[in-house]
């Protein structure tokens, strides 16, 4: 075929085209297999501790604690008292988990975990204590799994979370004496009285707390998020005590009983955060 000088012609070779197609097919199959393995490894599963569970648990109030101070408060003020039974736990793995595989046995005390507890004297009150890091790509699935454990009809959800005061945006000077403090966000269906001012713009919530609140808003579940802003990196008693008033309408807290446990929780955290110990 005649052409002008310097023109580049595409030369078609059926053998070359077929080889490239086979290579691309093999690569796609390998990529797909790797993707499935990663998804399986990072999936979230509910493990029941009650034997065979036919359906979701009856629940009127669900308390979810996410973050060091929130989970520490639940441990000191609630789980330290008698009458709570572990009913389920969530098995998941990510880059911050210990080991290289998703756990198959319930984590021991002090290990990263997410456990669902039920109050024996009032079985419709449940607590979800999350002491492990949930990756961003796991938040949606994690939230779906938590709410699959409970009946959502006439459900009230209280979310406890904590955040660094350095992330709080305000036009006024934020002194150390003004921390810790609480701010709240609620869904449109939440009609109960809140115990602190609402979170001002342009502040936002993120992580597991935001995922749970968004899920409740979409599914029209009554929910409120209480976020504690603190200038201390590890759990401390002052920050934990900020959550006490948020549960006054749901549970009666034993202040004197939790004092010793509260000291143990903060003491362990201080030892772990000390680089010179």
From Swiss-Prot:
Tell me which domain of life the UniProt entry assigns to the organism this sequence originates from.
Answer: Eukaryota
Under Gene Ontology molecular function, one entry of this record is: proteasome binding
Gene Ontology CC terms, in alphabetical order: cytoplasm; endoplasmic reticulum
Ranges in coiled-coil conformation: none
What post-translational modification information does the record give?
Degraded by the proteasome upon completion of 20S proteasome maturation.
Q: Name one GO biological process term.
A: chaperone-mediated protein complex assembly
Keyword Chaperone part of the UniProt annotation: yes
Q: Where in the cell is it found?
A: Cytoplasm; Endoplasmic reticulum
Annotated keywords: Chaperone, Cytoplasm, Endoplasmic reticulum
Family per UniProt?
A: Belongs to the PSMG1 family.
Q: Tell me, what does this protein do in biology? A: Chaperone protein which promotes assembly of the 20S proteasome as part of a heterodimer with psmg2.
Q: How does it assemble?
A: Forms a heterodimer with psmg2.
Protein name listed in UniProt:
Proteasome assembly chaperone 1
